[in-house]
């Protein structure tokens, strides 16, 4: 089928939790979904969109997927929280992926990129957390470092190549539609359910509905100011204790203690 090029969007990581919800939101607006491997069709069942193969580690595959695209939702990332060699498997892969992402968008003539960063890329020792606080100064964690430096690199390259870029920084996303493998938020929930994280810990999490984040991505594309970063999060955080209590009420069959 032909799509009007004018409003064609590409969503990378389109089988992931956020990517798939962005695709669903854009389905009436002209969208192409890209995934690293096309084997699993389940996330796209009944959806009227082109599904193409692209990998952030392969720039040419991105250039091909971006032909005729106006807005590029860069959702796909090679994210793990844990790795044998975090510098190589988490940090290097993602920074290389960001370089490929921006350069491919420039070569393909994309107008605007919505870059999905993370709340982990903010300075959260100063409360309340605001975009203007700057970046996280704690350098102990490769996941945080990759998110911080990745977002900075995205803005630097966008400026250098004169392409519009808006960053969104979601907190811990939950909600449907979700397909396996599940994201980091769900891994945390799973660890709690399996009693591998003690519920009495003082850890608080900032939950947000993935559909609200998808909507925030769309607003960043249509109304966001070029060069800005926008936090997409809840106004309040919730202790794990309260999260568990709500889960007990909603899903008594899980027998969460």
Where do the language-model regions lie?
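Conserved beta-loop-beta element that borders a ligand/cofactor-binding pocket
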Residues: 117, 150-176
